Amino acid sequence: RAAMAEFYRLTGRRYGLIESHQMEDAEYAILAIGSTAETAIGSIDHIRAHEGIKVGVVAITSYRPFPAVEIVTALQHVKAFSVLERLDIPLGPDNPLTTDIEASLAKAAMGSPGFPRLTTMPICYSGSAGLGSRDVTAGHMVAVARNMAGATQGKRYFTLGIDHPLALTVEEEPDVRPAGSFSIRGHSVGGYGSVTTNKVIATMIGDIFGFPVQASPKYGSEKKGLPTNTYLTTTKEGKILTHSELQQVEFVPLMDPTTWNMGNPCVGLQEGGAIFQHTDVEEPQRLWDALPIWAKYFMVDHHIRFFGVDTVRIARACCKSDDSLIQRFQGVVLLGVFLRVTPFKAEAGMSDDALFSKVEAPLRKYFGKKGEAVVADNLRAVRMGYEEVFEVPRAIMEATPAAVLAKGKEEWDAKGKDVNAFFI
């Protein structure tokens, strides 16, 4: 505790050995460490409101020394609790954190000095989550709460995120982002510079508009030439607590038009959202006509805005200093598209000149070492993407024959809804 107090004095950030969230009236609790605990914290408002389960979270900050008394104090009035750990040790009685918590409760039940005396022993559930770097999601937290609070006793040991006899079923992925959030799920091909583009967009959102942002890619050299995704969320208020691939998004850029044949990029796109597609055609009607009819149905039905521009043409026109960078310049063009399509500039009341005076700083941060010519090329690519991207008019979309949209609905209903599955 003294060390935590000293840390607060030096940094202004206060941490306890544990951090309790909505435990005052909780009947059930989820205990975890790190990002798993943050995901649980971000999910409990939804669980309380939509599941009617009074659940709280105990985030464990210190594993050694173990905060036994603090944990027992937090759990002394709950009916049951679930411990989530990112490992599975089958040769032990339980996973390590679960074992320590059970031992702490046992010491309290035996009347050990310093512990609160327990009148009843809460039921302990233990789960393995995030194995093999898998995501832990809000949907998992809903399943954990249901497992504890169901009419029949749930699985005392369970897994999350893997196909296993002990796995809990996830029936939905609720949207637990803070109010006012804006999320992007990019679909690209490894080697197109999408990772760098995502980093630059994140930097621009923070530096230009002052919003907190979380960004992550599916990253790895093995992705080169293969379909991949990037993810980004920003919010004007609150804290982004979830750390997983995004389902609910407002903007979906497609850097490769063949993405329409390799999955379902429309999954989770919110009402009134936007899709951008690289295209070598310049007529909105031709871009619309080339879409699969299930995508047309979804866009018309959900009032999606649809944009396009030839990123390859712009990349070739702008990349004068190094021809080997042309492919990656397609991602730079997307920066301009992002600034045009998203609402941030308009909401900030910023002129084009003011905007582009601020764009140069993040570009220089990432490309400045390559020389002034490269920075200038990048800035030109961003501006051309911003100025030349075009929108398919709503009139063209709604002129689609009703019979085509009806057939598109049939295909949409039959189509897979897993954004990560290809060829569905």
Predicted regions and their residues:
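Active-site phosphate/pyrophosphate-binding segments
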Residues: 1-24, 133-134, 140-215, 219-224
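Thiamine diphosphate
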Residues: 3-163, 234, 276-280, 286-300, ...
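Active-site cofactor/cluster-binding pocket
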Residues: 65-69, 80, 84-86, 175-424
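Glycine-rich nucleotide cofactor-binding loops and adjacent beta-alpha elements
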Residues: 131-152, 156, 161-168, 341-343, ...
